[in-house]
UniProtKB/Swiss-Prot annotation:
This is Putative ABC transporter ATP-binding protein in cobA 5'region. Probably part of an ABC transporter complex. Responsible for energy coupling to the transport system. Residues 5-240 form the ABC transporter domain. The lineage of its organism: Bacteria, Bacillati, Actinomycetota, Actinomycetes, Propionibacteriales. Its main location: membrane. Keywords: ATP-binding, Cell membrane, Membrane, Nucleotide-binding, Translocase, Transport. Residues 277-297 are annotated as: Disordered. InterPro entries: AAA+_ATPase, ABC_transporter-like_ATP-bd, ABC_transpr_CbiO/EcfA_su, Co_trans_ATP-bd, ECF_ABC_transporter_ATP-bd, P-loop_NTPase. ATP binds at residues 38-45. Its EC number is 7.-.-.-.
Length: 297
């Protein structure tokens, strides 16, 4: 299967750090859920910006549907019809006085009829669980609400690829659930999702593929295989997800996928521990609280 979006030998950086990314290769298939992992400053946001057409690389190429993107104004406008990026800080993407105006900004710039713009706004807000915010002023929203509205603005463009920089950061558990539910529905509808995150457990549970940014390059593969690479995980300053750590500690052939499976996996070891403890407790003198004759005199 050919990649919908790809980086080939990509080099990117800034004047004070010219090679944040050095000879990066990445291929993202249509409909993929890809989690982008890495330490702070590793280059995750830089890579997203290059793929979105917001930052021109100094070397290599970004391709969409097998063709290099055109970095001219017209070419970038066309690219952004297909690839949208949501920044980590929602305030960097909220410009209008109220929510509906803000979400409608992108579709209006596509030259759509007002009825179509309205339909897209309602659809995107509903998908993000934010339809009740449509008439609210953006400055009145909580951080989590602003994050959902900023995401709705990108969703309203109906892109082929939606890229999100730390979409669950700063959200409460309900907000995380709502965001994940929205992303799942988007992928079910065929949207390709690329999520930069520090949440390794989320990446393991949610993603079809993982790409780890480490030492200015990218390692891409299946989540379980890549996150089981102890050396790569350590060099990337990541934590081993608890399901993989538990599977390794117990010698399991498959990682537990949820808490119930983890408890079931632990049951034999806990049973053996309890039996050993009970046996030891039944031996005279084995209880530390037992007093000797000398102590009781």
């Amino acid at each position: 299967m050919s990649a919908l979006l790809a980086a080939h030998d990509l080099v990117a950086g800034f004047p004070d750090r010219p090679r944040v990314l050095d000879t990066v290769n990445l291929a993202i298939g249509r409909g993929t859920r890809l989690a982008l992992l890495g330490a702070n400053g590793s280059g995750k946001t830089t890579l997203l910006s290059c793929l979105a057409g917001s930052l021109k690389p100094t070397g290599g190429a970004v391709e969409r549907d097998g063709a290099p993107i055109d970095w001219g104004r017209k070419g970038l406008r066309e690219h952004r019809r297909h690839v949208q990026m949501v920044l980590q800080d929602p305030d960097d993407q909220l410009f209008s006085a109220d929510v509906s105006q803000d979400v409608s900004f992108g579709p209006m710039n596509l030259g759509l009829e007002p009825d179509e713009v309205h339909a897209r706004v309602r659809e995107a807000l509903t998908l993000l669980g934010a339809d009740h915010l449509a008439e609210r002023a953006t400055h009145q929203l909580s951080y989590g609400e602003r994050k959902r509205v900023a995401t709705a603005g990108a969703v309203a463009m109906r892109p082929d690829v939606l890229m999100l920089d730390e979409p669950t950061a700063g959200l409460d558990p309900l907000g995380v659930h709502q965001m994940r539910d929205a992303l799942d529905r988007l992928t079910d509808a065929g949207t390709t999702i690329v999520m930069a995150t520090h949440d390794v457990a989320l990446a393991l549970d949610w993603a079809d593929e993982v790409a780890i940014v480490c030492d200015a390059t990218v390692h891409q593969g299946a989540p379980e295989a890549l996150l089981s690479d102890a050396d790569l995980v350590a060099r990337s300053h990541l934590d081993t997800p608890w399901p993989l750590a538990l599977a390794a500690a117990l010698g399991l052939s498959a990682r537990p996928r949820n808490l119930d499976e983890a408890v079931a996996a632990l049951a034999p070891a806990l049973g053996e521990f309890a039996a050993t403890h009970d046996a030891a407790a039944s031996v005279p003198g084995s209880d530390d609280t037992t007093n000797t004759d000398e102590e009781t005199r």
